[in-house]
């Protein structure tokens, strides 16, 4: 459950290290984001000399959440951290690598490029 003011780790190699959610796209005013949802975020911490700088406004897709994600078959999955991957307007990742596992729910949102870059899909 990601809402505005939530801090997230960045799971790619764009140079950003930490994001803060400022808007959840889709839904109404009180909507919270979960795995596979797109957010607007600001970069709070970044590596020097990389394409993404501190205080940049970026689009990102949630790939891991600490809140349980219920699946249709009755199981649920939970991760140790909240993490996102920075994407462009066409929903393709801006980085060339994705770190850590990602949830299978990304397949429903047509984020197949992120799934193919991820080392593990849970």
Curated annotation (Swiss-Prot):
GO terms for molecular function: large ribosomal subunit rRNA binding; structural constituent of ribosome. It comes from the Eukaryota. InterPro entries: Ribosomal_uL14, Ribosomal_uL14_bac-type, Ribosomal_uL14_CS, Ribosomal_uL14_sf. Transmembrane segments: none annotated. One of its GO terms (cellular component) is cytosolic large ribosomal subunit. HAMAP family: Ribosomal_uL14. This is Large ribosomal subunit protein uL14c. It comes from Chlorella vulgaris (Green alga). The gene is rpl14.
């Amino acid at each position: 459950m990601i809402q505005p003011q939530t801090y997230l780790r960045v799971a790619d190699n764009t140079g950003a290290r930490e994001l803060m959610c400022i808007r959840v796209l889709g839904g109404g005013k009180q909507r919270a984001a979960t795995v596979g949802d797109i957010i607007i975020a600001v970069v709070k911490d970044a590596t020097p000399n990389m394409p993404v700088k501190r205080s940049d406004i970026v689009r990102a897709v949630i790939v891991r959440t600490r809140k349980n994600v219920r699946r249709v078959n009755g199981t649920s999955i939970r991760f140790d951290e909240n993490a996102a991957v920075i994407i462009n307007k066409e929903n393709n990742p801006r980085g060339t690598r994705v770190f850590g596992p990602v949830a299978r729910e990304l397949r429903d949102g047509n984020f197949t490029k992120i799934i193919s870059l991820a080392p593990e899909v849970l």
